[in-house]
């Protein structure tokens, strides 16, 4: 809840207004995960809060740290055998965390491990925040950038994600700039238009992964509902109205979507749009039939796009020695039970 709502809830409990400032600061600035940490509150009040206003728990069920680059992969538990994953990455500019918005995913992308364990439910704003707060405390760092690109589809959890954005950008909380937040969608067109109405200064990322309908429908079932014929006009409108550059995510799947022809079609699809392409060297997943593209194929793909004046980058491959692809840790945990 935001500060106004917390104040109202505490007022109904008969508490003075200054308690709201204390508690809000503990939760959203000091990242307290339990009332017992709030040492400037009387013990009796802490016990009352536990009973009447319990905090959502977000516990570390598993943690992997890359020996190569320090990337940290978390499996968080939310009770009742419900798990979601986050990845903490260190860059020159600071720390970025990739958080989940759902437990599992409905979208069924054939190359994504998030779908393999099945969909359970959407995460609440407090549970999305909990991933950030728990990681900050665990590593004793401050996170400056957030990527909503973990397990789940953010636009399928629209209201909770919007509420999360309100809380994480609040100046009385973590106060993270909206420009330091990226939201990734597989292409839920009505959700893109709803997001457009909000006029937020975040970065919209589109999980594209194929430049024509036949291939995209094969690897991404969402394309059968919202094809490129609907998705691309929505993207062009979003970029035009917000003046924000769209990032098109493109997982390089060896022998599937990495041909010269695919590069040519991708360039034609994006021609004239305010955007850039982020090529993703995929991590291998044992349960997936897909293999990563070779470095030579990626370079050729880049060359074709650049010759067509398409802005393209290759995502730095982090955590290759751990299960850094979203869904892998959760799937392993489910199999163990």
Walk through the language-model features, giving the residues of each:
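Short linear Ser/Thr-Pro motifs
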Residues: 66-67, 100-101, 114, 184, ...
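Generic beta-strand structural signal
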Residues: 72, 84, 95-99, 107, ...
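Conserved AdoMet/S-adenosylmethionine-binding subsite of the radical SAM
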Residues: 136-145, 150-308, 312
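Canonical Radical SAM [4Fe-4S] cluster-binding loop centered on the CxxxCxxC motif
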Residues: 90-127
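P-loop NTP-binding catalytic core
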Residues: 80-89, 93-94
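Auxiliary Fe-S-binding modules of radical SAM enzymes
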Residues: 1-84, 236-244, 250-337
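Conserved alpha-helical substructure of the radical SAM core
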Residues: 115-145
């Amino acid at each position: 809840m935001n500060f106004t709502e917390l104040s109202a809830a505490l007022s109904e409990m008969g508490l003075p207004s200054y308690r709201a400032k204390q508690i809000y600061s503990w939760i959203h600035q000091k990242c307290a995960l339990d009332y017992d940490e709030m040492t400037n509150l009387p013990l009796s009040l802490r016990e009352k809060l536990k009973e009447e206003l319990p905090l959502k728990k977000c516990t570390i069920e598993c943690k992997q740290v890359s020996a190569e680059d320090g990337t940290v992969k978390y499996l968080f538990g939310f009770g009742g055998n419900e798990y979601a994953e986050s990845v903490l990455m260190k860059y020159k500019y600071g720390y970025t965390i990739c958080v989940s918005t759902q437990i599992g995913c409905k979208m069924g992308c054939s190359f994504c491990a998030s779908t393999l364990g099945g969909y359970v439910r959407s995460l609440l704003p407090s549970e999305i925040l909990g991933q950030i707060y728990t990681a900050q405390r665990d590593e004793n760092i401050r996170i400056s950038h957030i990527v909503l690109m973990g397990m789940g589809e953010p636009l399928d959890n629209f209201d909770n994600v919007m509420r999360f954005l309100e809380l994480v950008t609040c100046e009385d909380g973590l106060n993270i700039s909206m420009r330091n937040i990226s939201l990734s969608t597989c292409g839920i067109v009505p959700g893109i238009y709803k997001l457009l109405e909000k006029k937020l200064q975040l970065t919209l990322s589109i999980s594209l992964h194929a430049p024509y309908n036949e291939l995209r429908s094969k690897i991404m079932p969402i394309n059968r509902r919202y094809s490129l014929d609907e998705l691309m006009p929505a993207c062009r409108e979003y970029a035009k109205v917000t003046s924000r550059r769209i990032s098109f995510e493109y997982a390089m799947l060896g022998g599937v979507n990495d041909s010269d022809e695919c590069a040519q079609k991708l360039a034609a699809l994006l021609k004239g749009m305010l955007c850039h392409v982020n090529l993703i060297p995929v991590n291998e997943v044992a349960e997936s039939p897909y293999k990563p593209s070779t470095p030579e194929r990626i370079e050729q793909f880049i060359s074709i796009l650049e010759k067509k004046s398409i802005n393209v980058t290759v995502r730095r491959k982090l955590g290759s020695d751990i299960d850094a692809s979203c869904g892998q840790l959760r799937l392993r945990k489910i199999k163990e039970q």
